[in-house]
Amino acid sequence: MIDLVAVQRACNMLAKRAGLRVEYVTEQMFCTEPGGRLIVQRPSVSWNESQLRIWRNAVCHEIGHWLPEVRDIFPLLVKKKINTSDVFGACLNIVDDIRNDRNRCNVYPGTRQDKVFTTEYLMSANWIPMIVKGDGNRELPNRIINTMVCASVGVLAYDDAPLHKTFSSVRTVLDDEQKAWIDTMLKDG
């Protein structure tokens, strides 16, 4: 049985260190942080271990964006009026996600296994369907974002060996041009 009090207490302590206020809601699936608030779905006693791990990873990921070491990207995006739903903003967000995940897994080593589990789960659950099923959409923005997502898993695999298999399986669905992009990113860093 999940100790909800302990789970929420841990969430509140981590958020406070990052300067965030936690707001629990029933309908929010993943976390957002508009205006210094961490809005997160309230955990449920009916959740299984996998659901709790994904929730913990989402919470730690969003808090990670606000840790002092990586807090700079969101103010910059707002100042420059860069929308993360556009291709350029999405790519910047993916790059920052890598930086965020590496940093927060170093600051809070206990979050690393939830990150590995969640990455494997999301890829196998077709969270990004065009990556898992192959890139049927030939539009350049989608191809770039899909390649960046794949590359981000590859970068995380350097630190977490279990993700090597996930990266290899995701990479197989990319076309030759996308694979060349990945090879260039991995080679040139």
Residue ranges and their predicted role:
Residues M1-G189:
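Short, functionally important secondary-structure microenvironments
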